[in-house]
From Swiss-Prot:
Free-text disruption phenotype from the record: RNAi-mediated knockdown in sugar gustatory neurons does not affect sucrose response.
Annotated residues for binding of ATP: L346, G347, D348, R392, K903, D1014, I1015, W1016, N1021, M1022, A1023, S1024, R1025, K1061
Gene designation per UniProt: ACXE
Main location group: membrane
Protein known as: Adenylyl cyclase X E
Amino acid sequence: MPRSLGNCQLNYSKERMWEPGYLKAKCAELRLESEFRLYRIRLWKSYLLTFFMLHIFVTSVHCALLLATIERRSIIYFDVALSIGCALVLILVLSVNFCDEFIAKHTWYMYASSIFASLTLVFADLTESIYHTYAHSWILGTFYDTYIIYMIYMFLPIHFISGAVLLALLVSGLYILYFVIFIAQGFAQFASALFSVGGMSVDIVHYLCLNLVGIFYRVMNDTVVRSSFLDRHQYIKEKIWLRNARLQEKQLLDSILPPQISLPLQKDIQGRIVMAKQGIHSWTAMERTMAIQIHPDVSILYADVVNYTHLTTTLTVEMLVKVLHDLYGRFDLAAYRYKVQRIKFLGDCYYCVAGLSDPDPDHANNCVILGLSMINHIMEVRDIHGLDINMRIGVHSGNLFAGVIGEAKLQFDIWGLDVTIANVLESTGVPGCVHISGATLNNLDVNRFDIEDGPEEARDHPLLKKYRIRSYIIRQDLHMDDEDSDEFLGDLHSISLCNMGAQPRISDSANQSLRALFHEELREEFRKMPVSAFSPKRLLGICRFNTGKEVPAHQNLNICLTFTDPILERAYLKQTDYMYKYSIILSASVGCSLVYIELMDTQMICSSCFVLPASVATIQCILALIAWYKKYCWTRYGRNNVPHHYNGFSCFIFRIHDKILNSLPIRICIYLFLMISSFFVMCLIVMSCQREEFEMAYIEERLFHYEQEAHICFHPWVTTNMLSLMICLTFTFAHIPIMVKTAVAILETLAYLLLIFFQFDFVFHHSVTTNPYFKSEYAHALLICITFLIMFVKERQIEFTNKVNFNWRVDLRKEENAASLTNHSIIIILNNILPSHIVDVYLNSLAKHELYFENYRMVSVMFAMLINFEMDLRSLRVLNEIIAEFDTLLLFYKEYYTVEKIKIVGCTYMAACGLDLNFAGSTSTNRKESIPPTEFNEEQSRRILFQQSNEDLDEVVFVMTSYALDMMRTLAKSNEAYQSIAGDRNITDGTIAIGISSGEVMAGIVGASQPHYDIWGNPVNMASRMESTGLPGHIHVTEETSEILQQFGITCSYRGMTFVKGRGKIPTYLVGIDENLNFIPQKATRFPSHQERSTVISLQSTYTHAENNNSIASTSRHTLQSL
């Protein structure tokens, strides 16, 4: 994390992620070393294949030049044969590394073959020179010294860098030893010439620089490869997580909605998230849609638990949830067997539809058989638990509307006249029997069932009489004998969820199996990772990025290794260069070496000969200081979290460093300056030569046989080696466009070739050659061209790895965004299924099929029903708008005491206040075990704090009643809007009946196939009765609720003794509301704990806040006014 250090920050976290030590430790931490080792073996095999092609090309060109340019070919047949033979031996020895099984068992062979190949080429090169020294008195220079060192560091399969360094130093030492023995002719002359002008120290510095360049390439290559590997690992993890998350999201949606409804909803949620992030809040972008479909020819089953009220008031919360979970779980499993889709259950009511998702000609039979099966199940549950319960079931066939309305706590539901008829058949039915209509009977196999006429209560029901519906009673299925029934019940019991709470969590073996599958998929993806920039498919325009599939052309790399998508290419070039410090330290090291060589090799005495090299060396040291100062500060202070105050100079250095890393133009300018200044340093050496004077001195030497002065002109092989280092340096800078580096290297090569063949052809021609009678200028040119070719090939490999790595990072960011979007949508969906306080519980506990229940001492429950609302398609559109407005009000009841929407039943809106885990008297033991000890203790402390004052919990009644009044205001405003629309003014009269009751409530999640959160208890039953017995335009409350409201200063008028089913006659009250829809006040003895709760939010203020927040409420008002 960034640490505040005085006036600036030392943020080294991103730079540290590109350090070799960090990447290696990260691989070890993720236990990826074995996979990385296998991937690196594949990489080295691709490097070897590249080296084979390169070495064959170099050997062929070298031998062809020898045979084409030398007239006395007999003398060079030995050289040609030795070169070809050595190439064959190298390829033969190194080819064994392509045998995967052998290398897997004998990894030591990779290093051993590298040593053998290197020393073979060294001895062949030295043998050729020594042979001609003794056989033909030719003093020859070596040809493969630079080439072998490059080969060791860049192409040979040496996994550990220390091994490559030791081998390269050995090769360098052998060549220096050859120079001492055969060129300097003994250690005495070597010592005397070591620090002489143009002496041996120049060659030693040259070899040291070659090794530095090789080490740099190894470090940079290992860093890039490890970074790519880790990025790929993260990408695969994100892809697997996203795949699982999408599967989870689909399962969640399918558990509440059929696919034809869930898919548009899923896309709509994700689209809204994206638009919100983009700041799009237009009317068209956020219009409400109504996800409702028409389904003809279906059968509707309504089932009601007889004596349910007694059940909820006598059982403990744990026992109640367990019984309901067992019962409804059995129903869900039976419905699944008979292809009937459960819609929802409402306390004691369970209803479902056959033929909804897929047309089913046998829908009536399936519904009736399911009804009889449900009766059998409840009989078994009654016997198991010793309960006095039974089942009353009604079935009707016809048409219906199905879908989702509202915008909070989304639930799939059904509407229509035939749905109402099915409900009436259930309420007028006989316990233990299936009550069906004539429409259902017409679709039944009548010979299968025992059918009787319907009860008298049904014949006298006004709705059934109005539509002339005749009903029938079915008591049993004649085709299902007791043995088959018992067998089916046993099967259901074996998979029933009644004991889900006792089931163990996922076993360790299952976890290990999942981990094994994950690692196997990782290994398979790693095996697909590309390893080479040279691919026939790439030449055809097909590029693969380890996906196993061809990617679109706009993401491909062309033959120049640039993205064909210019936007992607620009993004790649604008990356921060975290490898800059390594490039600049290498440049400084090589630059200082070039300055040293220039000072040792030049004979001119002039101010520019010293000022320019000194200036170049100074600037390079300053750039190196800027590049490494941040690393130094982090090593000294940041790593150990040592507090330190940085002065202005340090902050200035930090800012310059960050500016360089983040600016491509600045880095290119620095790069070009270093290349040009280094080339000028070499030019000083070359320009110190007086060509005419050298030619005359050389002629006089040949005529008069005296030794020429050593420093009359530059040493050609010294300058050639300098340019070779410069070409290496040209390609060392990371995150400089490869086209720029290639262009600079080509210009350097061409400029030097002009010097060789034109400007100083005489000097180069009379320098030491590498083969007898082989023109020296050809030897110089060949070495420069080989160096350029090696560096260009290696740079393409590094650039390819960088481009693939970048493409993966881009894909990773896309996957992370997609994963974040999916995760966000999952949370939204969960919060629209379950109350927010148990979403985490569902993810942690219910996903493992564990029971969950809660017990609350004080909860206020509200039922609100729209009066005289016809359930046709036009009315459903209006109902959707009204319910959405009610849902919007919930946004203003999220503080302290939260109002939770429970469900919608037809035109009835059910909500509760006080369902907060902090107020829960008890929860399931599984929940407590799932909470960490610290969090659990804090949670218990909060509960005790709230439980110490029972009066504080009574405030939920005031909040719930305030929300109910806001609903009445919202409906009044909506009704005004509908009155201005000709087609909608007669849909509803805008009246609502509301009932509220408060007290102890039990809550939990039940069901086998769908997570359903519900509440039970006397307040739930009483609130429903208050609504059904209430008056339109009033809030009907119980005596206990009215007493609490009066304490908060709200008048409640006594209505009288009201008959309530299951309770008889009880006193009830109407909340005092004036004509302006405000509470009628009275003297208050208590006040809301949060003052903002004392001011009830009106619809007008709701719209004002909603417009400011671009909420959905303002959209609804706009939609209503524009209809």
